[in-house]
Amino acid sequence: MDLGSKPLIGVVHLLPLPGSPGYRGSIEEILDRAISDAAKYQEAGFDAIILENYGDFPYSKTISKETLASFAVIAKEVGREISIPIGINVLRNDCVASYSIAYSVRADFIRVNVLTGVAFTDQGIIEGCARELAELRARLPSRIKVLADVHVKHATHFSSFEVALLDTVERGGADAVIITGSRTGSEVDIQELMLAKKISPVPVIVGSGLNPRNIRLFWRYADGFIVGTWVKEGGKTLNEVSLERATRIAKVVKSLRGE
């Protein structure tokens, strides 16, 4: 994935996987939805997708073996159906599982919610996993990029935003940073985004609350965009991707690029 072209990344929110409380007993249902959503993103003109076990709430800090195995199978099958890059995000913060899946299915990037520092979340206290991820990357070298949140949503943070960002890059090894609002679907603080763009030595990606209106506002301050909630039917996170909505926002991005 080319982070120099301001990529538009669509989120495939997976239905509850085996091992999670909400699993319905059908991997085929999960796979069919994932392939359908991914195909719509590609048809709409998105540059990449990211698979996320969003339906597995309440989340554990690390995932079970059955969840990891099913996630990997689904990611592999989705990859066979589309040609755009794929990313992996294992909630709540299982960066080792994310990288392991990405490595095995030849994905292009992963997202890590808490790479460095500490976050106080609805799952309890989550500590950064930079060391574990760095060791795994050393054992399994690849071109997989690490996109890491700074002051991730659904969490309280006590370090300053500036310190957290610089630590995420300089000590955590992030290839890009992600800035979000306070919750899924919440718009980012433009002042925070502007600060991130000013001080970050790596690309800055907007990771929540995007729509065709505000993506124009954020364009000059961001190097990429992750879209999930707005492109769903009715703007509801757990619904299927709306091809019409996905196409609308993709057309805005292409217009801003001058394509």
Swiss-Prot record:
<dbReference type="InterPro" id="IPR011060">
    <property type="entry name" value="RibuloseP-bd_barrel"/>
</dbReference>
<protein>
    <recommendedName>
        <fullName>Uncharacterized protein PYRAB10620</fullName>
    </recommendedName>
</protein>
<dbReference type="InterPro" id="IPR005137">
    <property type="entry name" value="BtpA"/>
</dbReference>
<comment type="similarity">
    <text>Belongs to the BtpA family.</text>
</comment>
<dbReference type="Pfam" id="PF03437">
    <property type="entry name" value="BtpA"/>
</dbReference>
